[in-house]
């Protein structure tokens, strides 16, 4: 298994290959989408053992740390694969890649115990270098969802960056917002100030305006998968701390397959 000190070195190298909020669109044949792993290094290793070899691209949707005690090693494992082939691995940012959550859900304590508190600065630098989003095969991939003032995908490329918390409202909402059936527009979320639920009408408008098929995201605890807003939004959850299944989504040409681990 990747050691903590090795992770410290890997994230420094990986950071230099990131550094912009929106990645270039990708068109590939076989894609593996991985949701929140939250320190579940066993799930991450299974993804690489079972699916990586046949894939053209693996997209991680954020939330690698917190809610467990192997977040450092989980980050290191993914970063090591990313450095082997940066064109085959995408590491998107989640809301738990932030000092807004790490002091409360375990990652700051984990880093302090394994590497010393001062080393957390390097993880913060890594987190703020992570991209928010990428369009893959005409699906918008990100952690949370669309934002109240986001009209086009191209706006993401112009967001303030790096933005550690993030403080920009759009950047924050990309990581924190959730889809909800039976609502219209945007409604304040129980997650707190600045976070919103988005409904089917604004989602359909955004997808149509940007010629997108749908949204693939993480962020919510589900039993592997959930489809919302008439299937336009797919949520993937790839950890097992909640006692349910970990899911990965495979997009192979026009065929979409949900696999529970």
Regions found by a protein language model. Give the residues of each.
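Feature recognizes metal-dependent phosphohydrolase scaffolds
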Residues: 1-261
């Amino acid at each position: 298994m990747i050691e903590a000190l090795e992770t410290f070195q890997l994230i420094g190298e990986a950071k230099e290959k990131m550094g912009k909020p929106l990645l270039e669109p990708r068109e590939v044949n076989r894609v593996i989408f991985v949701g929140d792993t939250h320190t579940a290094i066993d799930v991450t290793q299974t993804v690489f053992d079972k699916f990586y070899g046949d894939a053209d691209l693996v997209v991680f949707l954020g939330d690698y740390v917190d809610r467990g005690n192997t977040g450092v090693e989980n980050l290191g494992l993914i970063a090591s694969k990313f450095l082997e082939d940066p064109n085959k691995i995408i590491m998107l940012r989640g809301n738990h890649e932030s000092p807004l959550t790490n002091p409360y859900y375990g990652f700051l304590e984990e880093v302090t115990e394994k590497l010393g508190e001062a080393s957390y600065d390097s993880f913060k630098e890594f987190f703020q270098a992570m991209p928010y989003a990428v369009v893959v095969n005409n699906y918008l991939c990100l952690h949370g969802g669309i934002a109240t003032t986001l009209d086009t995908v191209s706006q993401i490329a112009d967001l303030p960056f790096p933005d550690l918390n993030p403080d920009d409202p759009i950047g924050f909402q990309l990581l924190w917002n959730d889809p909800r059936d039976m609502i219209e527009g945007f409604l304040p979320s129980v997650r707190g100030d600045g976070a919103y639920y988005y409904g089917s009408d604004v989602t359909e408008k955004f997808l149509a305006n940007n010629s997108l098929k749908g949204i693939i995201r993480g962020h919510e605890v589900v039993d592997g998968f959930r489809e919302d807003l008439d299937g336009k939004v797919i949520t993937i959850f790839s950890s097992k701390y909640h006692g349910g299944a970990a899911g990965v989504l495979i997009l192979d040409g026009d065929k979409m397959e949900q696999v529970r681990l």
